[in-house]
């Protein structure tokens, strides 16, 4: 990293960042492979040493500019065992390295700006978790009856993304290469819906797309920082840029800036005395104190502003005025709402006693049962009605591997949806996975589910059927006496940094 910093010379205030030559450096691709993402499919050949040579990179660029970019003959496949028959490998390798290179000016300039201002950077692993959103919603959104549910649109033209990066990167060669990538391999569906990947780009190329998407979204989100400074009574507290998370964390008294990881996972929090803003993936929520008329004015103020100054075509129907007390809010894999929680308090003064009825707003979260059953049905764990079926592709595995894979999916779902106010829907999902596992094992041994479990015993599924109480008792052995009460309440785990698509579980 020091070598990259010396090359860019970002400490000079008006230094142009010539990033294009970095594409030909071997260590760039080594660093891109070591940033926590599973790229083992690129390295299936044991003879490959996890690096790209200068000659290979030059050949990749040459092949991409040829007429048939993705065509590989059988002779070439036999001569080069590393590339094989993967038609997406050429743009895939360059895309990974190019995304890593584009992130350098953002991260390094952020470090330098914080160092100049002598701000203390606090690294907090808890803020990385997706679950950290929901305590924020519980503390603030329960007081707001109306929120704006916003579906973030895509830029109307690809050139807008290039123009956005021109403010950060002054290297014309890199921008030309970026423009080539966008027009040749771009697919917007792969951004908003990762499971609908482009035919020319696999899911390994989402890093470049998410980086461009978040850099563009951060541009129009800057309006909230401006509005916050205009409306806040504490204008002395400065506010920084809203960037992605992992390296840099700074917390100010009236403002929370969450810097997320490598522009990969979309999450921004902005805390203001009058306005609250949350974004996750392609959806954002804006809440403010006021009447429905006031929120409607916000809607018709922001839409023309974003369209005129940021070229974002916000259709009015993509911004909904949601009353949380009557409608559910779909956000972050949960269905959320605000309901009145009535409680009766008995008070006694001397010889007189009386009852006080108290009602407070409570922010509830529920498991979206229909979308989850749809995902399980697409992954062939059940049919569209939720009836468990056997998983044919796993019948060739050992019994322990089958139980482990089903159990891992069940534990991941239970882990993420542990914040649900009601567990009935979660129990149904776990029942589908358990019975699907039993049917898969019975089909492998050519038996019925009842006969199979009776012959081998229920201890075969002991690890798979482990309850949350047992998991918590293993995690917190000293607090076993109070686990029963904790289990009934919602639990937010601050170690969840990504979601796994069930459809891709094999």
UniProtKB/Swiss-Prot annotation:
Domain of life from the UniProt record: Eukaryota
GO cellular component terms attached to this protein's record: chloroplast
Record family assignment: Belongs to the intron maturase 2 family. MatK subfamily.
Compartments where found: Plastid, Chloroplast
The keyword Plastid appears for this protein: yes
GO process terms (BP): mRNA processing; RNA splicing; tRNA processing
Task performed by this protein: Usually encoded in the trnK tRNA gene intron. Probably assists in splicing its own and other chloroplast group II introns.
Name of the protein described by the UniProt record: Maturase K
Pfam family, one: Intron_maturas2
Keywords, sorted A to Z: Chloroplast, mRNA processing, Plastid, RNA-binding, tRNA processing
GO molecular function: RNA binding
């Amino acid at each position: 990293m020091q070598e990259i910093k010396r090359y860019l010379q970002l400490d000079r205030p008006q230094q142009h960042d010539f990033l294009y030559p970095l594409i030909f450096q071997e260590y760039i691709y080594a660093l891109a492979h070591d940033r926590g993402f599973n790229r083992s499919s690129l390295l299936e050949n044991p003879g490959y040493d996890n690096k790209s040579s200068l000659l290979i990179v030059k050949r990749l660029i040459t092949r991409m500019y040829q007429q048939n970019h993705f065509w590989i003959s059988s002779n070439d496949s036999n001569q080069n065992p590393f590339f094989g028959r993967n038609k997406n490998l050429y743009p895939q390798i360059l895309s990974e390295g190019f995304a890593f290179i584009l992130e350098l000016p953002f991260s390094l300039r952020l470090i330098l700006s914080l160092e100049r201002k002598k701000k203390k950077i606090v690294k907090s692993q808890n803020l990385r978790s997706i679950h950290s959103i929901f305590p924020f919603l519980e503390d603030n959104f329960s007081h707001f009856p109306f929120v704006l549910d916003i579906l973030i649109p895509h830029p109307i033209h690809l050139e807008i993304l290039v123009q956005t990066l021109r403010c950060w990167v002054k290297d014309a060669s890199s921008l030309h290469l970026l423009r080539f990538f966008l027009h040749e391999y771009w697919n917007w569906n792969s951004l908003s819906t990762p499971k609908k990947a482009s035919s020319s780009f696999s899911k390994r190329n989402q890093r470049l797309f998410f980086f461009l998407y978040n850099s563009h979204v951060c541009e129009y989100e800057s309006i909230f920082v401006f509005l916050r400074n205009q409306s806040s009574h504490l204008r002395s507290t400065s506010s920084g840029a809203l960037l992605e998370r992992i390296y840099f964390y700074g917390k100010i008294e009236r403002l929370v800036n969450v810097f997320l990881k490598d522009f990969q996972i979309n999450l921004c929090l902005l805390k203001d005395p009058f306005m609250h803003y949350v974004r996750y993936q392609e959806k954002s929520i804006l809440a403010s104190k006021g009447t429905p008329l006031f929120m409607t004015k916000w809607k018709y103020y922001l839409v023309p502003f974003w369209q005129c100054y940021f070229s974002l075509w916000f259709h009015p129907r993509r911004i909904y005025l949601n009353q949380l007390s009557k409608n559910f809010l779909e956000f972050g894999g949960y269905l959320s709402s605000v309901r009145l929680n009535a409680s009766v308090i008995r008070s006694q003064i001397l010889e007189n006693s009386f009852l006080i009825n108290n009602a407070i707003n409570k922010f509830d979260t529920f498991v979206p049962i229909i979308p989850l059953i749809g995902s399980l049905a697409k992954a062939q764990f059940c049919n569209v009605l939720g009836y468990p079926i056997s998983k044919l592709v796993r019948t060739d595995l050992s019994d322990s591997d089958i139980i482990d894979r089903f159990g891992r999916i069940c534990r991941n779902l239970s882990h993420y949806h542990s914040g649900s106010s009601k567990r009935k829907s979660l129990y149904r999902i776990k029942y589908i996975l358990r019975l699907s596992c039993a049917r898969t094992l019975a089909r492998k041994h050519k038996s019925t589910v009842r006969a199979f479990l009776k012959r081998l015993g229920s201890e075969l599924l002991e690890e798979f059927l482990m309850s949350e109480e047992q998991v918590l008792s293993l995690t917190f052995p000293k607090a076993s006496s109070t686990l029963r009460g904790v289990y009934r309440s919602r639990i937010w785990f601050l170690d969840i940094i990504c979601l796994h698509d069930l459809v891709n579980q094999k």
